[in-house]
Amino acid sequence: SCVGEYGRCRSAYEDCCDGYYCNCSQPPYCLCRNNN
């Protein structure tokens, strides 16, 4: 399964659902954010 918006992810892009990317700009966690 994939991770939705604001869900925690690792640095791997694949963790997030389609249309989202893994954003690590706010440590300590990486969160999935919308590509738009």
UniProtKB/Swiss-Prot annotation:
Which taxonomic lineage is given here?
Eukaryota, Metazoa, Ecdysozoa, Arthropoda, Chelicerata
InterPro entries (UniProt xref):
Beta/delta-agatoxin_fam
Per the UniProt record, the source organism is Hololena curta (Funnel-web spider)
Bridged cysteine pairs (disulfide):
2-17, 9-22, 16-32, 24-30
**SUPFAM superfamilies according to UniProt:** omega toxin-like
The record's subcellular locations are: Secreted
For this UniProt record, the keywords arranged alphabetically read as follows: Amidation, Disulfide bond, Ion channel impairing toxin, Knottin, Neurotoxin, Secreted, Toxin, Voltage-gated sodium channel impairing toxin
Tissue expression as described in the entry: Expressed by the venom gland.
Q: What is this protein called?
A: Mu-agatoxin-Hc1a
